[in-house]
């Protein structure tokens, strides 16, 4: 709630240049955005940030676990180095609601960023052993169709037993606006 705490907000803003200079990627999470997300997802405040855990877990497991189509740190670096800001998106649901999964992902950025002009996209689609090429293709095509027509897309896919009947999309989109190219938020 920085609006009520201008000094705290100023200190936070002043710290970002040092963070950018001393890190490869900086993840910025807005309390206002968390509040908005909990309202949009119809969750109480205590549970409203649970999707961040899903987002981080999806990002880390994409990098650490072997998939059918693997994404790695170099792929991640390639995408986040596009000039502009970047954000992480996550959406999940059952295999019968593929459009809803994409819609949920597009409503999940950590900051209020418009992703339609994204120049880079690192997208991981995870499903159970029942996930088909149709599921992978449908989710990916619908998601990517909303980005810049020249967007560089790197696709990963993984199957895991705990995702039976479900699909999860974790994406990093970059090249948004014209600010620091290392901000994910």
Question: Whereabouts are the PLM-identified features?
Answer:
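Tubulin/FtsZ superfamily GTPase core signature
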Residues: 1-185
